[in-house]
């Protein structure tokens, strides 16, 4: 009895310690003086020192903040770069009026010296969200304010089980944010002060397809959104700081922006939104889409694009002169391959005389194959059999051996670095030796997307594609901001252009408006998924992977169901079922790129046979499983098994549920679809569906589509 009493006492002490630990922050923020904003949903409090004491979801009671600083600022002189200023040396004047807290720093101090730099921060409550604004005024001679990291939620208190949701490649879901950040590529750490922090690099509009991210739980979460119509390149700030040596366990989240304010300049931004919310991750989609609707400019796509299952991406002539396909193959073997898998579209690469990734922007027709007449005839013959032809151009690369670069205005229309020298890119395609890929590579400059002559050429190429008889024009690499933007070196300090994503969006809008005025059925596509550029395109060719364990393309599909985009990297007979199933499950069209566009799908018979089955199901229910079907994730239905992955598509009174499993032993579960009656199902592999559609049993990589009506 005495032993039991001791155990119970110990348990009670342990419980009281845990309660004390969980409530310590709440007690602290109540005691520490500061400035409070509150509505029915959220509570935010800033301390007298300008630190963030409270960021609370009032419904759950959870406080994400820990009393850390809200900002960091970086400036350069001519002698030293990237000097950091933060709240530790600076004391603010804080005021509170209505729903706004204003934090003012006059004459910022760095290393004990007062600078003629002012920073004003605002924290405003707006309908359950917090809007963070900032103004930088620089009057310090010989300086430039390069970067402002704000707002920052440091040493974040994340509820147990909350995952990091980014919009990388349309969506990625990471179980452990700290683990993702800490375990970055060690090669990048060599160049960074990794003893201070670890950082996960993510920018919009580059790998981040939308300008937001979130920490998501089953029924609540914390949303970070940059609601910035300027489309300035923005970093999604994700860092881990150490609580002890080499123990990086303090999560920090925020946004990083780039004022580039020289002496005499003022810069402002009020686009940062942070919102504790209730609901599943889909609430983050609703928050972002509600803002995006204020300037979304997506037009309906032609029916043939809605019915497109994907495309064969094929290189006709390669970079180094090898002919992989001839014009006459288009209505011949290429057509036969497409028909064998239910794909009636070709994305034609390397159709010009110089070959793929060579000669840009010449695009001279290949006279050795019969010239323009032969190419037009091949396209006409291919289209006559019910097919569609998409013509490729590169939207940004300039070959330094091209006529336009050597004899035209090419050198004036390319991006320059911070010394005025041209950036160089190399696309190292190889033959079967080593010389070509490692030594004898093509060198490209990068077109300045603000250049009018370049933009006019893009439009001219669309006209040329229409003249050839193509159905669409495709511009490679126009969906994303530049990694190496143009620098202006005319001022006291060189300044990078952070609006290249906006320029590309403007260029795509010009092309879209031009071609649609001529022929509404003629279409436009690009590579890289970004919401700011996808809105002007009829389809998008993705970059990177969509079927990794952390891949979550559901986020972008749910947020922008009208955008048609592809998978990538399924190019041989390996792991076919899982990856092909993923495209049907997630609503992605197929990018058929056999052997990196060097082969045709009849050279990969396993992939060929399986994709034919996938597309047969798509063609059976095109109004649901192709472009017209609206991706609804799991809205309106439930599956009892966590081992079954089920996703829904709706159109009118009909609903399709696509279900599969990755479990080696298979899985069984019940489907509940209130308000709908089961009609039928179509399956591939080891699948059993009961007569009323309420229960299903699926073997590993089996897949089924269940149809319901109300």
Positions of predicted regions on the chain:
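Polysaccharide-binding surfaces and accessory modules of carbohydrate-active proteins
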Residues: 26-43, 63-105, 109, 125-238
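Active-site-proximal substrate-binding groove within the catalytic cores of carbohydrate-active enzymes
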Residues: 259-260, 264-270, 503-687, 695-709
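Active-site-adjacent "subsite" loops/lids of carbohydrate-active enzymes
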Residues: 323-327, 374, 391-468, 553, ...
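The substrate-binding groove and active-site-proximal loops of carbohydrate-active enzymes
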Residues: 310-328, 357-372, 438-457, 490-504, ...
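Acidic/aromatic-lined carbohydrate-recognition and catalytic surfaces
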Residues: 348-429, 506-526
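An acidic-aromatic substrate-binding cleft motif
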Residues: 275-357
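Beta-strand-rich recognition/accessory modules
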Residues: 36-38, 126, 194-307
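Bacterial N-terminal signal peptides
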Residues: 8-16
